[in-house]
Structure formats: structure tokens, C-alpha cells
Amino acid sequence: MIYAGILAGGTGTRMGISNLPKQFLELGDRPILIHTIEKFVLEPSIEKIVVGVHGDWVSHAEDLVDKYLPLYKERIIITKGGADRNTSIKKIIEAIDAYRPLTPEDIVVTHDSVRPFITLRMIQDNIQLAQNHDAVDTVVEAVDTIVESTNGQFITDIPNRAHLYQGQTPQTFRCKDFMDLYGSLSDEEKEILTDACKIFVIKGKDVALAKGEYSNLKITTVTDLKIAKSMIEKD
């Protein structure tokens, strides 16, 4: 089975324009989270869309699904997320297992709730690549020169941009593989390895690159929200 896991566990309101976490802010005529879920609803191979939300916001998320996506609510599960990204993925996979016991072939397409401009092509590419690889990471080529500084004051290295990519989401992998690899980490490793695909890389697994889009914006600042609103208006 193919599942989607939407990471919507953040509670930050640092934009300073609302008491709502950013995934619940309005973008056009509906919340950012709803825009994101809608993209996954369009992919018929996805059995269930599991949304990991902070415990304080579960009922709010359920109300939004009832209001904006009543025809698809049977395909959507709202569950309590974890304290960080990887524990939220773990909670999402546990919710999948509760819905239907996991098999070794079950795949989850994980995605940031605040990336509402994901395309159907990106979702399908992730699913296709995950059939033949241990994991998939969605990326775009780095367009800016990236500099490295070990002390925050002086440049210590300028890597070759031709070899660099900017990570986005989705990140896709088999549910059981993630649970096994995450479970094998020490507490210290869990603190350091906050990116799911990095766990696969560190453990020597095959992580394929899926082509992202520069429009696959992650809305984390007021400027991001302004850009996103402009993109919605143009559409």
C-alpha cells in the first residue's frame, strides 16, 4: 500500500500575524494545510493520508477536513504527532499500522504541511522511485553559491555548486525500513539526525533523488507567506 504522511506538528506562531500555527493560516480561500492535503487526494494510488498534528490542534485539524474536504474525509486520518520531525513520522506510521497492519512493502510519502505547492508529478515520481530504492529525497539544484563556516565568522570552504542540491519534501520510504532504522539509533543519534533521509544515508542505504520544483516553497516566514499569496493570486 501507498500512504501519505503530512507533517503538521508545528506550533510556532513566530510570524506574529496570528495565534494560529502557520500550517493553519489562510492562503487564498482556505488554510495552507488544506491546500497541501488536496494535492495528495488527487493521487488515486494513495490509500490513506495521515496528518500528524500537535495534540492541542487535532480537533481543529479534524474540523478543517470536515469543512473543506468532506468528500474525502474517509481517506484522511488526523493523528497526534511527536515532539520532533522523526518522532512525528514514527507516530504517523504507527497510525498506519493501527489502520492496517504494516507489510514490508508499505510505502509512506512524507511531506511538510507548509509546502502547499507540491505537484502531482512530484508525488508520482517519489512513489515510482521508491519502488526500486531504499528511500527518495526531493531536491532542486542549488542556484546560490553555498559557503561553509565552522565558526560563523569566516569562510572555511566553498563547495562545488555543481554537486549541491537543496533538499525539499516529499521524502519517501518503506514504513518498516524507517521504523527499523530509527529504532536502531542511540538517543544521541536521534538528537543529531533530524532528517529522515539522512538516517538512510548514514545507515548506508540507497537514497534516490527526485526532481523538485523551485515553486515548492516552504512557508516559514512572513515573506514566504506573501510570496505564496502572490502565487495563489496568479493561479
From Swiss-Prot:
Keywords: Cell wall biogenesis/degradation, Nucleotidyltransferase, Teichoic acid biosynthesis, Transferase
The organism's place on the tree of life at top rank: Bacteria
Binding positions for CTP per the UniProt entry: L7, A8, G9, G10, G82, A83, D84, R85, N86, T87, S88, S113
Enzyme Commission identifier(s): 2.7.7.40
Residues the record marks as site: Transition state stabilizer: R14, K22
Biological process annotations from GO: cell wall organization; isoprenoid biosynthetic process; poly(ribitol phosphate) teichoic acid biosynthetic process
Signal peptide: none
Site (Positions ribitol 5-phosphate for the nucleophilic attack): R161, K218
UniProt pathway annotation: Cell wall biogenesis; poly(ribitol phosphate) teichoic acid biosynthesis
InterPro entries per UniProt: IspD/TarI, IspD/TarI_cytidylyltransf_bact, ISPD_synthase_CS, Nucleotide-diphossugar_trans, TarI
Protein family: Belongs to the IspD/TarI cytidylyltransferase family. TarI subfamily.
Protein's UniProt name: Ribitol-5-phosphate cytidylyltransferase
Gene coding for it: tarI
